[in-house]
Regions:
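Structural detector of well-ordered beta-strand residues that form the stable sheet scaffold
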Residues: 2, 27-29, 58, 128, ...
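Predominantly a Rossmann-like dinucleotide-binding segment in NAD(P)-dependent oxidoreductases
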Residues: 34-140, 261
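Short, well-ordered coil/turn segments that N-cap beta-strands
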Residues: 26-27, 53, 156-158
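Contiguous beta-strand/loop segments that form the cofactor/metal-binding neighborhood of enzyme cores
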Residues: 107-195, 221-233
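Short polybasic amphipathic segments
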Residues: 180, 196-206
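Beta-strand-loop-alpha-helix segment that lines the small-molecule cofactor/substrate pocket
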Residues: 1-34, 49
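C-terminal helix-rich "cap/oligomerization" subdomain common to oxidoreductases
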Residues: 13-15, 23, 229-268
């Protein structure tokens, strides 16, 4: 089974999926970005001990994508933007369509949390989040975040944080500002997720066209290869059902924290 994110909008459904996967003895892969070249190199640096014992990690994950009209454009008397209709308009030929409104934490949180899980090999125990609706009218109308920051307490005394948002297509020359900062007892590293990349500029270039293009990106191929190897050898994929469930639990805890303004324990 290969599934796109989010794993589910309910933690109970994630648990049901795990039970079904294990009962039927099948393999499950939750789609992720962990095979991007810079991320692989960062993982190798951490595993080699180059920065010593891992103490802290931070991820900036800002997608430079639009989500319909910007915040503040709805006129008095206009009806709220319908979530499903907006998703159908944006994703007519691909996935990510659902009737339940979700903020960026739920839609894209798998990616930065997937990095944190892979690089630290630790579970998140407690979170504190602040969320806002800063950019897009559809998020305002449906009461979901498009910008958030989350503080994390992990196993082994590791602390972490992430910032996530959907910040508009004209805000960045690449798909977004996505960087991972890792601090250890002997030093630190900064991983620019987009590298390697080339910049392309030409006359009369459309203003919303990404100027930077990624190269040497075999993430999709490597994910499928990893899944095929799991089927052939019996090993677990890079992000299996239990790993996906733990990430979902962290997301749900962060959403709750953003609503209550209080730290929330993550249910494992």
């Amino acid at each position: 089974v290969i599934a796109d994110k989010p794993m589910s909008t309910r933690l109970s459904e994630c648990d049901r999926l795990i039970e079904a996967v294990e009962r039927n003895k099948v393999k499950f892969l939750l789609w992720n970005r962990n095979f991007l070249p810079a991320v692989i190199q960062g993982k190798e640096a951490v595993q080699s001990g180059a920065i010593g014992e891992l103490h802290a990690i931070h991820v900036d994950f800002y997608f430079s994508k639009d989500a319909g009209p910007p915040k503040g454009t709805r006129q008095h008397g206009d009806p709220p933007i319908n979530w499903l209709e907006r998703q159908l308009e944006a994703h007519a030929s691909v996935g990510a369509v659902g009737i339940e409104a979700m903020g960026e934490l739920q839609i894209e949180g798998i990616y930065p949390l997937g990095y944190i899980r892979m690089l630290t090999d630790a579970n998140v125990r407690r979170v504190f989040a602040r969320t806002a609706t800063h950019f897009h009218q559809v998020n305002v109308d449906n009461h979901v975040d498009d910008l958030a920051t989350v503080s994390l307490e992990l196993d082994n005394g590791i602390v972490g944080s992430l910032c996530i948002g959907r910040i508009g297509a004209a805000s960045h020359p690449d798909i977004g500002e996505i960087k991972i900062h890792v601090i250890g007892s002997k030093g630190g590293i900064v991983i620019s997720e987009a590298r390697p990349e080339v910049s392309i500029h030409y006359r009369d270039q459309p203003p919303l066209e990404f100027k930077n293009e990624r190269v040497a990106n075999e993430n999709d191929f490597l994910l499928v290869d990893n899944f095929a190897r799991a089927l052939d050898t019996g090993c677990e994929p890079i992000l299996n059902a239990r790993g996906g469930r733990d990430i979902a639990a962290t997301v749900f805890a962060a959403v709750e924290s953003g609503k209550t303004g209080q730290p929330v324990e993550v249910t494992h």
